[in-house]
A protein has these predicted regions:
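Tandem CBS (Cystathionine beta-synthase) repeat/Bateman regulatory domains
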Residues: 1-142
Length: 142
């Protein structure tokens, strides 16, 4: 594999559009949303971006569900996303190189990185699975 493929912009990965929810959505509703089967998420989704006025304000992942809801035994009917999300997550753009995403995921122990435009509006999300699938295409053809 030629390491230069990691210099390609993130949009080469064809990242899926972001699943976004409002910061005041009850956790119980978000859990149902994360389980929904869609053409782009055939087994549900592991992360949802949280917005307020169309701007990214947080991310809620499966890890957040375990650490901030299940473990402390919070009432999912009375808790809203803004109380348990990861605030102001680190972001990238579709034009950033793939290697930036790998580095950010490695340093932050993330599996999902939000992609935003110049107004901080979500345009997608990149996952470790997206990167692994992209790299594997080049391994097979090598």
């Amino acid at each position: 594999m030629d390491a230069r493929i990691l210099q390609n912009p993130i949009h080469h990965l064809k990242p899926p559009e972001a699943d976004c929810v409002d910061a005041e959505l009850p956790v119980v509703d978000l859990i149902f949303k994360m389980q929904e089967i869609t053409p782009q998420h055939t087994r549900g989704t592991g992360a949802v971006l949280v917005t307020q006025d169309s701007r990214l304000v947080g991310i809620f992942t499966e890890r957040d569900l375990i650490r901030r809801i299940v473990s402390p035994n919070k009432d999912i009917n009375k808790t809203v996303i803004s109380q348990v999300m990861t605030n102001q997550p680190e972001t990238l753009t579709k034009e950033d190189p793939i290697v930036f995403a790998l580095n950010l995921m490695h340093l932050g122990h993330y599996r999902h990185v939000p992609l935003v435009d110049d107004k901080n509006s979500p345009v997608g999300v990149i996952t470790s699975k997206n990167i692994a699938q992209y790299i594997s295409q080049f391994m097979i053809t090598a």
